[in-house]
Amino acid sequence: FVVDPIFYPGGDIGDLAINGTVNDLACCGARPLYLTAGFILEEGLPLADLQRIVQSMKRAAERAGVQIVAGDTKVVERGKCDKLFINTSGIGIVPPGIRIAPDQATPGDVVICSGPIGLHGITILSARESLGFETDLKSDTASLNIMISELLHTIGEVHVLRDPTRGGVSGTLNEIAQDAGVDILLDEDALPIPEAVRAASEMLGLDPLYIANEGLVLVILPESRAEQALPLMRGFEESRQATVIGRITKQSGEQARVKMKTLYGNYRIIDMLSGEQLPRIC
């Protein structure tokens, strides 16, 4: 994790490292158990900053119900590292019968987004460049494993779980479409994009669908299960704004595409982003 700045509204590099690894495991259908953490520290980093970050990691691990079982530190010369980098690894257990994978997306499934889109990326950019948007925004960083575990236990028939971090919602859905060989149709009117994110994105020439998120999960499951899944997800603070944003329309093989029905009723192709829109956001 190399996020810049290391402290920002809604979180810091410490809880981001824990939440990111926990969510990666949870989106495989696993119950996260143990994490390791390796720190690369720049010479001169204030010990108070390191202590603050480690305490943040401790709180995030406790909230997620995981243990940090090993760690290591290395110090490099000033200028060889920007303040602090963290490397984490995690181990979890996938319960019997769980089969979560991008290629499981099936025509007739719907796509549920667990919350507001674009908060983390815009918050980081604003804090880094002192743009002032952070007065209205904060990162959505959160661990989602407890909610996901309850979803899998209660609903059972969940086909795909993905956290739309780098590449955003668009990049993640394009990867799913290619892996499963299916077309995905989004409804622009249903996208939960906060007005502050929309305004900041327009000002900066960015598309919220390509902006990274750190407390969001995309859930793909049969439409018949959505009515049961949505109230369950909304019962958790981190997914209380869960909503259906699209559906899997047809099997398309190598021609799989992501499209969006716009507010004006026409259709737009949502391609993979070429290059990286915002570096060092996680």
Where in this protein do the model-derived segments appear?
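Glycine-rich phosphate/pyrophosphate-binding loop regions near the starts of catalytic domains
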Residues: 1-113, 119, 124, 133
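Aromatic/hydrophobic pocket-lining residues that form π-stacking "cages" and hydrophobic walls in ligand
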Residues: 21, 57, 173, 197, ...
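Solvent-exposed alpha-helices and their adjacent loops that cap or buttress functional pockets
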Residues: 28, 61-62, 77-83, 102-106, ...
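Structural motif
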Residues: 32-34, 65-67, 83-89, 109-112, ...
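Active-site-proximal betaalpha loop/short-helix elements
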Residues: 42-44, 137-213
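Hydrophobic side chains in well-ordered alpha-helices
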Residues: 147, 229-232
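Helix N-cap motif at beta-to-alpha junctions
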Residues: 221-226
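Acidic, Ser/Thr/Pro-rich beta/coil linker or hinge segments at domain junctions
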Residues: 235-282
